[in-house]
């Protein structure tokens, strides 16, 4: 299952957790606020991962996260991939900033 940025934004903020599976080096250059950076193979065993929330899995472009979300769903998690990955999230944030700047002028 994939969720668009718009779908994620519509979710109750207490109902999901973003899991960023990108490398620490990639995350050092930017990350989604509140996301947990956990490598794909460690999600099941990481104590920070809530079992009572939807997991929104994020990779760079939204490809690897699809496989990880499917695997986690098979293991009993409520998981989905962020469509387009971090790059899509970043582009959306840049668009929002542009709109805000236009509204200020």
Residue ranges, per PLM feature:
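Rhodanese-like catalytic fold shared by cysteine-dependent sulfurtransferases
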Residues: 1-17, 24-54, 63-105
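Short, surface-exposed ligand- or partner-binding patches at beta-edge/loop junctions that are enriched
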Residues: 58
């Amino acid at each position: 299952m994939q969720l668009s940025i718009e779908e994620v934004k519509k979710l109750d903020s207490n109902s999901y957790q973003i899991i960023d599976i990108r490398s620490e080096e990639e995350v050092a250059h930017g990350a989604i606020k509140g996301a947990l950076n956990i490598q794909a193979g460690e999600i099941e065993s990481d104590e920070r991962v809530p079992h009572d929330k939807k997991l929104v899995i994020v990779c760079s472009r939204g490809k690897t996260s699809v496989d990880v979300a499917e695997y986690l769903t098979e293991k009993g998690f409520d998981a989905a991939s962020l469509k387009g990955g971090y790059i899509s999230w970043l582009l959306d944030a840049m668009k929002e900033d542009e709109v805000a700047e236009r509204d200020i002028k």
